């Protein structure tokens, strides 16, 4: 499962809280179903996070196993065995991850996120072939170049399912120009808080 999370400024506030809750529920569901879950957050730039690796590291930490990021490898790496265990026998190698949702801010561009999504669908050793893809966004995203949209349709035709969760104000009247590229888009409407 790929989750593409819009972290642009338009998702600040209530949409941010809704998406944070959705990510937590998706993590739990993916773990219950024993499915990989990969998060790509995007605004102008992108960042990819393996949510299942993050959860596994958190569980290991709770039972007393120290997790060592590859960026924190000690200079005296001779103290590590060939299987990556620290000299105490309690270290575990992993790629750096994050422990919280990304910062919300900036504009929105789907180009980099789509390139990263396509790369993972193509080049991840058949691990994510035909994976389900879920976008959590307000879909106020400028259309990328036509060749990217054509590629999007190719994936859809070959079995990849694309879903969206559109988070918008209850008075939103903007048409969703992305709907033809997705199998289904669910809409969550919220009423903005009024301050008197």
Language-model-detected regions and their locations in the chain:
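Conserved ATPase-coupling elements of RecA-like P-loop NTPase cores
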Residues: 14-15, 144-146
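A short, conserved beta-to-alpha structural element at the edge of catalytic cores
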Residues: 29-39, 156-176
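An active-site-proximal "capping" alpha-helix that borders the catalytic cofactor pocket
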Residues: 18-32
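Structural beta-sheet core signal
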Residues: 3, 39-41, 133-135, 164-166
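MIDAS-like acidic motif and immediate structural context at the N-terminus
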Residues: 1-22, 138
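Catalytic-core regions built around general acid/base machinery
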Residues: 26, 150-155
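Von Willebrand factor
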Residues: 47, 55-134, 140-144, 165-176
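C-terminal helix of von Willebrand factor
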Residues: 112-115, 173-196
